[in-house]
From Swiss-Prot:
<keyword id="KW-0521">NADP</keyword>
<dbReference type="GO" id="GO:0051287">
    <property type="term" value="F:NAD binding"/>
</dbReference>
<keyword id="KW-0288">FMN</keyword>
<dbReference type="InterPro" id="IPR008254">
    <property type="entry name" value="Flavodoxin/NO_synth"/>
</dbReference>
<comment type="similarity">
    <text>Belongs to the WrbA family.</text>
</comment>
<dbReference type="InterPro" id="IPR010089">
    <property type="entry name" value="Flavoprotein_WrbA-like"/>
</dbReference>
<feature type="binding site">
    <location>
        <begin position="114"/>
        <end position="119"/>
    </location>
    <ligand>
        <name>FMN</name>
    </ligand>
</feature>
<feature type="binding site">
    <location>
        <position position="99"/>
    </location>
    <ligand>
        <name>substrate</name>
    </ligand>
</feature>
<feature type="binding site">
    <location>
        <position position="134"/>
    </location>
    <ligand>
        <name>FMN</name>
    </ligand>
</feature>
<dbReference type="GO" id="GO:0050660">
    <property type="term" value="F:flavin adenine dinucleotide binding"/>
</dbReference>
<feature type="binding site">
    <location>
        <begin position="10"/>
        <end position="15"/>
    </location>
    <ligand>
        <name>FMN</name>
    </ligand>
</feature>
<feature type="binding site">
    <location>
        <position position="12"/>
    </location>
    <ligand>
        <name>NAD(+)</name>
    </ligand>
</feature>
<keyword id="KW-0560">Oxidoreductase</keyword>
<dbReference type="InterPro" id="IPR005025">
    <property type="entry name" value="FMN_Rdtase-like_dom"/>
</dbReference>
<dbReference type="GO" id="GO:0016020">
    <property type="term" value="C:membrane"/>
</dbReference>
<dbReference type="Pfam" id="PF03358">
    <property type="entry name" value="FMN_red"/>
</dbReference>
<dbReference type="GO" id="GO:0050661">
    <property type="term" value="F:NADP binding"/>
</dbReference>
Length: 199
């Protein structure tokens, strides 16, 4: 059975919501076991609460070493100036031992993201791919295989690189049904490829 990890960081809940949709999509594929986890918070609890961070996230916290236990990993991170959030960066910076042993080589990897106003969403995904490439991941984008990506009639996230959501400058916009559909597609697509490679 192929094992998929959906690993995310979410401060305000937008990425958490996308992560749940990604995991839901991956679970549609038979012969796949899906786990949803998050990376540790690095902001002190008091500052996190003061900033309005979402404190009731149910997903357990992952450790870097356990990444080796999965056949495919789908990473979710908000955009911070066109790059992954510092919490995800800190987590991945602890995978040097896995890199040295080649423990992640040949695993399937994919990325989804969120932004406040849309700026940097694609670059966040592709810049995260750099870390995955150093580990030897087989990187899987979603392409334009889902019709929602062609809808330009209103504001929405979603790219051929991976699912995204646009939260708005104040974070009040929640992921739309279209964005969640794209996220589910990404999970299902990555799970299918992982299962094929595992068989």
């Amino acid at each position: 059975m192929a094992k998929i990890l959906v690993l995310y960081y979410s401060m305000y809940g937008h990425i958490e919501t996308l992560a749940e949709a990604v995991a839901e999509g991956a679970r549609r594929v038979s012969g796949v076991e899906v786990t949803l986890k998050r990376v540790p918070e690095t902001i002190p609890a008091e500052a996190f609460a003061k900033a309005g961070g979402k404190q009731d996230q149910k997903a357990p916290v992952a450790s870097p070493q356990e990444l080796a236990d999965y056949d495919g990993i789908i990473f979710g991170t908000p955009t911070r100036f066109g790059n992954m959030a510092g919490q995800m960066r800190t987590f991945l910076d602890q995978t040097g031992g896995l890199w040295a042993s080649g423990a992640l080589y040949g695993k399937v990897g994919s990325v989804f993201s969120s932004t406040g106003t849309g700026g940097g969403q694609e670059h966040t995904i592709t810049s995260t791919w750099t870390t995955l490439a150093h580990h030897g991941f087989i990187i899987v984008p979603i392409g334009y295989a889902t019709p929602e990506l062609f809808d330009v009639s209103h504001v929405r996230g979603g790219t051929p690189y991976g699912a995204t959501t646009i939260a708005g400058g104040d974070g009040s916009r929640q992921p739309s049904q279209e964005e969640l559909t794209i996220a589910r597609y990404q999970g299902e697509h990555v799970a299918k490829i992982t299962a094929k490679l595992k068989s």
